[in-house]
Amino acid sequence: MDRAAKADLVASLNEVFSTTSLVVVAHYKGLTVADMQKLRRQMKQAGATVKVAKNRLANIALDGTNVASIKPLLKGPTLLAYSSDPVAAAKVAVDFAKGNDKLVILGGAMGATALNPDGVKALATLPSLDELRAKIVGLVQAPATKIAQVVNAPAAKLARVFGAYADTANKDEAA
């Protein structure tokens, strides 16, 4: 890798570190290529990204960003998983690590807050941003639905009474 390519990589990593809300650091020693591809696919489906970069270049890219607290974790064969959703990368990384003991979560950073491995695992148990939005929409819509049912209930009861009266009137005329 020549100097220009290294400078481009540092610049792109710096932009990633500046814009993402969560970065997870993990050791991947012993992962097969197939396992790594599977992890990348799962991350992509969740809206997250996995990157393997030289630790020295990643350290340079971390300068001046909120997530600089992960610098001490960058030792050995490390991968960086990041996402703009504060939960996506952690959720996929933790789930993958449960099924594959070769991936070891070292920690991470959410904004300026450093996370230890337990912090990343706790973050993975939280609902995603889309799940929270769906719950809020459901909570907002529930009262409106109940109000509509209450308003329509008297009219429905009245319609049933008229229907029953019409049925009895038709039976009386037939008899």
Curated annotation (Swiss-Prot):
The keyword rRNA-binding applies. Pfam families: Ribosomal_L10. The keyword Lipid metabolism does not apply. GO terms for cellular component: large ribosomal subunit. One of its GO terms (biological process) is translation. One of its GO terms (molecular function) is large ribosomal subunit rRNA binding. Keywords: Ribonucleoprotein, Ribosomal protein, RNA-binding, rRNA-binding. Signal peptide: none annotated. CDD domains: Ribosomal_L10 (cd05797). Forms part of the ribosomal stalk, playing a central role in the interaction of the ribosome with GTP-bound translation factors. PANTHER family: 39S RIBOSOMAL PROTEIN L10, MITOCHONDRIAL. Belongs to the universal ribosomal protein uL10 family. Part of the ribosomal stalk of the 50S ribosomal subunit. The N-terminus interacts with L11 and the large rRNA to form the base of the stalk. The C-terminus forms an elongated spine to which L12 dimers bind in a sequential fashion forming a multimeric L10(L12)X complex. This is Large ribosomal subunit protein uL10. It comes from Methylobacterium sp. (strain 4-46).
